[in-house]
Design a protein with these regions (language model features):
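Predominantly soluble domains enriched in secretory-pathway, periplasmic, or organellar proteins
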Residues: 28-29, 33-332
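Bacterial N-terminal signal peptides that target proteins for export
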Residues: 4-25
Length: 332
């Protein structure tokens, strides 16, 4: 176990430093502090036109690395242990697996024509990839990634595939349709279609799994689904071309990006009303929150940037330049 930085620096003999103790203590202090800094969450941003993933240190809000994936990276998910990224690559019809220790692609898994959204179950056991031109979802067991199950959905051009918090259900939105398909993960089959607004895109669950929120881009609405009944129970007017969804970890606020208005709106879960709207870059798309729920990172597809929002005060903090046409964000 590494002692805290202050203890090492002030009492080196306690830890057996007898040869040049001050210099040795300072060296260990620097290494310990560096290790602590590297442990801060990172935001990973796939850039469609650059063929890269930008790595943002959420402590400093600076890009600290760029991972070359090639092709057209879009959907992205991170393993719970922080060792791997899963990134869909549209031109090659594959899922790129990124080794985060080496920050390079370690393998590619064929999933189908034009993959987009990528989801991962909370326990990391399952990965899901929405495959647009196949009108299907590829379900992949993380322990045996070459064993893939393709599940057909009713919605045309599926975009996002998001697991419920308990991992039992997978909700799939479709760009060319007005439905969300529900897949039973254990059965590997679609069991229901829920009618929502036109061009449903982002999906987010409350932490307890009781509700799902779906942004419908062409309807400028967010649809609230009761997950036990698998039916819409409320519709919330959002901004123009609403598309991305992110849920604060405390379950009190749902964020929706408004692609046609360069803004992000905050929905109070208790009242079902928008309580704040924050300006961001052009064509805000998919988003992610830090684990503590304090900061929201928003990919701005036409500004080539990521906007950072104070997710408690609902105020803009800064914009971070990234690659061309950022698609979304995952924080791990």
């Amino acid at each position: 176990m590494i002692p805290d930085c202050t203890t090492i620096a002030t009492d080196p003999k306690r830890f057996g430093f007898h040869v040049e103790p001050r210099r040795l203590a300072l060296s260990i202090l620097a290494l310990a502090c560096l290790s602590q800094a590297q442990a801060a969450p990172f935001a990973y941003v796939p850039n469609e036109r650059s063929g890269t993933v930008s790595v943002i240190d959420t402590a400093s809000d600076r890009v600290v690395a760029t991972i070359k994936t090639g092709g057209k990276p879009r959907g992205i998910a991170a393993s719970p242990d922080g060792r791997r990224l899963y990134v869909s690559d549209q031109p090659t019809g594959s899922l790129a697996v990124v080794d985060l220790a080496a920050r390079e692609v370690s393998e590619r898994i064929a999933v189908g024509k034009s993959p987009e959204g990528v989801g991962i179950s909370r326990d990391g056991a399952w990965i899901a990839v929405a495959v647009e031109e196949n009108n299907s979802v590829s379900l992949i067991r993380a322990a045996a990634p070459r064993e893939l199950t393709s599940v057909r959905v009713s919605g045309q051009n599926p975009e996002h595939a998001v697991f419920s918090p308990d991992g039992k259900w997978l909700y799939v939105s479709a760009e060319d349709g007005a439905v969300v398909d529900v897949i039973d993960v254990a059965k590997r089959s679609a069991v229901k279609s829920i009618t929502v607004g036109e061009r449903p895109r982002g999906i987010g669950f409350l932490p307890d799994g009781s509700r799902a929120y779906v942004a419908a881009e062409n309807s400028d609405r967010v649809y609230v689904i009761d997950c036990e009944r698998a039916e819409v129970i409320a519709v919330i007017a959002a901004g123009k071309r609403s598309n991305g969804i992110a849920v604060r970890p405390d379950g009190k606020v749902v964020f929706v990006s408004n692609g046609g208005e360069a803004s992000v709106s905050a929905i109070d879960v208790a009242s079902g009303k928008i309580t704040a709207t924050v300006p961001v870059g052009q064509r805000p798309w998919n988003m992610a929150l830090t684990p503590d729920g304090k900061k929201l990172y928003v990919a701005n597809g036409r500004s080539n940037s990521v906007s950072v929002i104070d997710a408690e005060a609902m105020t803009p903090l800064r914009d971070i330049p990234v690659g061309e046409a950022p698609w979304g964000v995952v924080v791990r």
